Amino acid sequence: MNQKQVWDNIAGEWSEFKIHPAHHVEEFLKGKKGNILDLGSGSGRHLQKIPKAKMYLVDFSEKMIELAKEKAKKKKISAEFSVADLTKLPYENDFFDAAIFISSLHCIEGEKNREKAVKELFRVLKKGAQVEVGVWNKDSNKFRKAESKERFVKWRDKGARYYYLYDADEIYKLFEKAGFKIVFKEDPKQMIIFVAEKI
């Protein structure tokens, strides 16, 4: 079973499990204007009404995007939805004014593919645009004893999700290598959360 099939399988239960947006995402999006990209949006956990802004949700799971569309309709939020791989985004260069990349980069298999996804994000952001990033932290109490940075984590009986565990320096360097400047870092806990700007 490939990862698209796994996430399609768990989409319904995941949507019920991940209901409320993370507080740090709400704070980051507050007051944002223009086009906002949600990379690896899943079922639309972070979908919200933002005055003077429009959200674009992209995920490689068709089932997740279907659920996100239902959520948007229920909440009466106008948004755009795409089923696409994060290594090949279906958007023009310099299109987005801001982005969120929460708990999805670490789900991409292969170092080259993760690098490509960050480069694609850089391509579609406008100069000066910021992205909030969140990935699992290899050095957190939860994962400190993990023998490998690559893990497959089961979701009940629906399949195993791929995760790559970053350490803080590694993820910061990945974004800097792509041309970003790190402008804010939260103290890493279970998640490494930071804001990067396209310069």
Language model segments and positions:
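Conserved A-loop
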Residues: A11, L105, F122
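A short glycine-rich, Lys/Arg-flanked "PGG" loop and its adjoining helix->strand segment in the class I
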Residues: E115-K127
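A short acidic, Gly/Pro-enriched loop at the edge of an enzyme's catalytic core
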Residues: T87-A99
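Class I (Rossmann-like) S-adenosyl-L-methionine-dependent methyltransferase catalytic domain
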Residues: M1-L37, G42-K88, K112, Q130-I199
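A short, aliphatic-rich alpha-helical micro-motif
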Residues: L29-K30, N93, V118
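A short SAM/SAH-binding and catalytic strip from SAM-dependent methyltransferases
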Residues: A98-K112
